[in-house]
Amino acid sequence: LESNSKNKAIANILSFYLETNLHNRLNQDLDSLKARLFEAEQALDTDSKLAKSMASAKNVVLSMPFVLGVPRGNPDEALPNYVLKNALTTILDRVQAQSQGLYPITTVAAIPPIEQLGPLASSIGHLNVIPDIDGAIRSEALVLKHYDRFYPSIALQIAARSLNLENADIKVNLAESVELGSLQIKTDDQLMMNTFFYSNIGDFPAFQVDSFYDVFSGKIPLDKY
């Protein structure tokens, strides 16, 4: 290579190569790059940020989808303890439901929240939707049966927390109902609760739908809820 090369790119490479403090500059640049990478890792670690906010709030309810199906043996692996503690323990059979095989819808697997977030949740509930044969959704599975345990839906968990109730306060009457304190929710024999149709009130829907962005940006105050 000649220093008077007419190719500007080659000339720049030559100048860079001949520089006496080349390695010193490289080390400095690499150190700077490490710092930038560390900052990027911190900025992109959204799980840690979410975990921190959940630990501060102490009232976050997480969802957990189950895989529906009929168990033929034992589960492949046990669910983590932060999921197990959400299993319902007050299960009553007043109508001989078990002898008739009347149980909630069964599952064969679950996808729990990640370990970084699960232990920080106020509670965890299933997020499964059970459509009718025509695809319409007319009912809510308040409880699912996962092998020998019963897990509430996220809707049931939220309702319980809004009443200042814990999982131990949720009572399941097989093939009959679910009780939240003094509130009794009638169900079918699979603990499915029928959802109701609410017609519009004049020109307005029965339930107003707000934009998440409007709430998040402060356009709609949180006090509304």
Name what the model sees in each region.
Residues 1-188, 224-225:
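Non-transmembrane functional regions of envelope-associated proteins
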Residues 146, 186-225:
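Membrane-proximal, cysteine-centered motifs at transmembrane boundaries in secretory-pathway
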